[in-house]
């Protein structure tokens, strides 16, 4: 008997257990859907914080009996709870807006493998049975596909925790007729991807979209001799490297995307900011209603007067109505030097009484105002059992 046989037998047992775990997770999700249907009938909120806290406390106690530490149990079940919450939110939204869950054509930046493609897949997996891909070369093309009916939805990045706002997307939002109908956050783990056996000293050219270069500038500064080549998306960069089959070129992108192009990970890169996330928004031709059982977010676009204190006056309206602003972004108004438009994310349902009062007051004190969309908030803040 070789020394590998006992190890092989143990791995087979682990694989068998993993299959059982997957089946149980799928069964649990089906039950979460049934819970969502019950909440729909009883009109109870999707989130029940007390129930979540009790659940975690009970599981931590049970875990101790099996020598599983509290941190492990908490991390694992917070993720499972988040999945249940988002699954139920999607169910309620489909019912309220009479959305056909069968299939949707979704436009995104780049060919397959881009971060936008991964985000589109994530959104589609929760909302539709079939995802028809529509990769685009530019952000403007994505908006145009949905505006002209070639696609049903657009998924575009809007901000990153490391490199900040995606200005091109904010500028397109100024002029589009589309509405924001959803959001999601994607963890961004950049890798240096190559087409074969090579090492860092052999690389002389790196391809990627401008955003990853910004987010990984500290790492790149260690290799000042590398030539930086910009592409329209991370997937376009991967495509170039895959076609080149050269030990001297690499792409910055995701490991999942690299796998689609047959690339290997040469180096896992820590971004300038350790927790690197990109927030994406989903756009459609028609605005949606958001169930009052679901936490909602409303995005506004407004222009204030140029007099001193105009923006502060507008923000005070939100405070006076106990509305929480989660983001404020400014962009220049093209053709009007020194004038700016402001984008606001507000933690509220558009149809709530306080939001309606605030909109009325804002309409009276701003030069212009537009609701870009009201949509379910997918920021599921985990419950702390302690």
Curated annotation (Swiss-Prot):
Residue limits of the ACT domain? 299-376
- Mutating residue 11 to A/K: what's the consequence? Important decrease in catalytic efficiency and affinity
Enzyme Commission number: 5.4.99.5, 4.2.1.51
pH-dependent activity: Optimum pH is 7.3 for chorismate mutase activity.
State the UniProt keywords alphabetically: Amino-acid biosynthesis, Aromatic amino acid biosynthesis, Cytoplasm, Isomerase, Lyase, Multifunctional enzyme, Phenylalanine biosynthesis
> What GO terms fall under cellular component here?
cytoplasm
**SMART domains according to UniProt:** CM_2 (SM00830)
Stretches assigned to the Chorismate mutase domain: 1-92
Outcome when changing residue 52 to A/D/Q: Important decrease in catalytic efficiency and affinity
Q: According to its UniProt record, where is this protein located? A: Cytoplasm
User: How might one describe the regulation of this protein's activity?
Assistant: Both activities are inhibited by L-phenylalanine.
Which Pfam family, just one, is annotated for this protein? Answer: PDT
Name its pathway. Amino-acid biosynthesis; L-phenylalanine biosynthesis; phenylpyruvate from prephenate: step 1/1; Metabolic intermediate biosynthesis; prephenate biosynthesis; prephenate from chorismate: step 1/1
The catalytic activity, as recorded, is: chorismate = prephenate; prephenate + H(+) = 3-phenylpyruvate + CO2 + H2O
Biological process terms from the Gene Ontology for this record are:
chorismate metabolic process; L-phenylalanine biosynthetic process; tyrosine biosynthetic process
Kindly report the protein's main subcellular placement as a broad class. Answer: cytoplasm
Query: Ranges for the Prephenate dehydratase domain?
Result: 105-285
Q: What does this protein do?
A: Catalyzes the Claisen rearrangement of chorismate to prephenate and the decarboxylation/dehydration of prephenate to phenylpyruvate.
Q: Indicate the quaternary assembly.
A: Homodimer.
Q: What is this protein called?
A: Bifunctional chorismate mutase/prephenate dehydratase
Species for this entry: Escherichia coli (strain K12)
Q: Which gene encodes it?
A: pheA
